[in-house]
Amino acid sequence: MENFVVEVGMKLDKNLNYYKKQLKRNGLKQIFKCTTHDIYFTKEKSFDGFSENQIKKSCIRIRNPQKKEDKLKIENLLKEGYRKVFDTIKKDYHYQSKDMKSRIQLQIIKKIGLVVYYDNPDYYNFSLDKQRKLLLKELNSYGFSFNTNELGIDKLRTLCYGKEMFSKNQNG
């Protein structure tokens, strides 16, 4: 059986500075920050019944489409019958401590808000439910306060339907 990786993406209710301070207080350092513009294209007529992962796999993502070569890719996709479905801009802040194999990502996503994303390769061999619980427990050890029954926000499904959509796994 193929292992499936869980990534949690939890919507946050306080401001960015609050969580930056929490992470710093708990020994993490900001190691990266950027602004990213992604445009997604698909040939799908509808995403009804699709999971976050299925939507992402059915799309072609062009990252930072301002570059000349990406403008040509976009023209070709449109000629091949693809349609633009999502146009997202996010600010990304990555945090890590020396002993972490992965990064905690704080993202401000246009039309969604502030979200924390996290996965951990140490948990990949566990069941989906166990991975999720371990990830939330670990996030809580860094100053967050999530309940293990709380669902994460699905970015693409939320953008698709124009309302917040939640599930147990935000791995796209």
Where are these regions (language model features)?
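Structural motif
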Residues: 4, 68-69, 112-116, 127-129
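Intrinsic disorder/low-complexity signature
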Residues: 34-35, 61, 116, 126, ...
